[in-house]
């Protein structure tokens, strides 16, 4: 890859993760949301086919998590498959096509996200609600 091609790739990746406007800022000066976007950009620089996201929405406000979901959807639009481990359920429900719920490593539900969340076992284990 030439220097020019690498620069173009970086520009494209920063645009994909909504960081183009911050391209000249130091990482330490970025907000938590933008640091998470930067982590995505670093991973995308390797041109992966699959990304594993582990609790990426942790620590974000609901508004920030929503903005991160938009960023993740942009990444998915680049034909990158995403495996996402997360406890911020509203972020998952806004983004995923399929949800798998584990409890101590055991599968308790899988399928369409809203149907999975309505499952009595998921309600009991994760919400403490007896249905």
Q: Which residues does each PLM region occupy?
A:
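Glycine-rich phosphate-binding loops of nucleotide-dependent enzymes
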Residues: 1-131
